[in-house]
Amino acid sequence: MATRNSPMPLGTAQGDPGEAGTRPGPDASLRDTGAATQLKMKPRKVHKIKAVIIDLGSQYCKCGYAGEPRPTYFISSTVGKRCPEAADAGDTRKWTLVGHELLNTEAPLKLVNPLKHGIVVDWDCVQDIWEYIFRTAMKILPEEHAVLVSDPPLSPSSNREKYAELMFETFGIPAMHVTSQSLLSIYSYGKTSGLVVESGHGVSHVVPISEGDVLPGLTSRADYAGGDLTNYLMQLLNEAGHAFTDDHLHIIEHIKKKCCYAAFLPEEELGLVPEELRVDYELPDGKLITIGQERFRCSEMLFQPSLAGSTQPGLPELTAACLGRCQDTGFKEEMAANVLLCGGCTMLDGFPERFQRELSLLCPGDSPAVAAAPERKTSVWTGGSILASLQAFQQLWVSKEEFEERGSVAIYSKC
């Protein structure tokens, strides 16, 4: 738990390969003896130049090269579309702005997020983001790099076909692979089996994985996550007398990261004298505001979503229900012993300890063990970086030639 009166920084922030049993796990690099080189494959430039890993999230698109420990680029998933009615005749400025381009314009913009609760709803914006990643951020020629793209749990199967069409037809990449975000997350832990509990900005999932196989029939989803926590914090602050609006969400996001925490025993926190909870926060205009119980009350919505108007169960209940659906005793024990937290929303101070307590109360006979890796905010990307670096994985790239021969369904042959 965060120290209640510790000084806080002031200001605002800137902003399934192969068949079952054949998937190369994260420890394959320790076992790999070069057997994959005996495969009859045409040599491609893709093996000589590092692959690109792209994890498109609701808040940021994380990207970088395979083999790196963490993503190099964090690109906002918000795209700015210029308003046609505001443009003068002969205006040659860009109509779509991404990343740092959004900071350097005075033109009226319509802000669009291409994802809703983790699912792509605007493919044009996805194309705009990827174009920015290749040409502006990474400054690379996409036709020279294989690309691994993450796909959220329970997403429409057509998503993978659309990813393939965009990458091969629009960007001309030589090879690609699409795989489950949850599978990549578990690889970041160095495991191939476990219960992945991931909560990012727009959606949360509880996903059982057995020896590299994602089990969608046992997977649970909740349409709340870090973005909803931010909105709830703004509601609490306004109830305390402030006047924040959606235009201030970046400030609220920073307050959440720097001042808020999950209380291990919220009843005890409520009994503290105000002075033990209060911290001052300096707004960009220099004004100081005091934040009290809102610091821990906001995180309660992850355990009681009804506080923020949701009818879905809290994350511990969602996880306990998933364990309850595991009928095989040995499998259930394995899942309970490997509950893995992933995603930025789980980075809140005190959350792992509180989650462990709540889950243990709900599943006393299962002895659940919760793990929280320090870099779990980027667990999906890191898992992709590990996977794409393995020699045993190289046979699982879908080539441009395969796409041209079979169309977008070629993606299902290896993904």
From Swiss-Prot:
Keyword tags: Cytoplasm, Cytoskeleton, Phosphoprotein
Record's subcellular location: Cytoplasm, Cytoskeleton
GO cellular component: actin cytoskeleton; cytoplasm; nucleus
Superkingdom of the organism of origin: Eukaryota
Tissue expression as described in the entry: Detected only in the testis and, to a lesser extent, in the prostate.
Underlying gene: ACTL7B
SMART domains assigned to the protein according to its UniProt record, in alphabetical order: ACTIN
Disordered, as annotated region: 1-31
Name listed for the protein in its UniProt record: Actin-like protein 7B
Keyword Cytoplasm: yes
Family the entry assigns: Belongs to the actin family.
Pfam families: Actin (PF00022)
Record-listed Phosphoserine modification sites: 6
Organism, scientific name: Homo sapiens (Human)
Gene3D superfamilies: 3.30.420.40, Actin, Chain A, domain 4
CDD domains (UniProt xref): ASKHA_NBD_ACTL7
Chief site of localization: cytoplasm
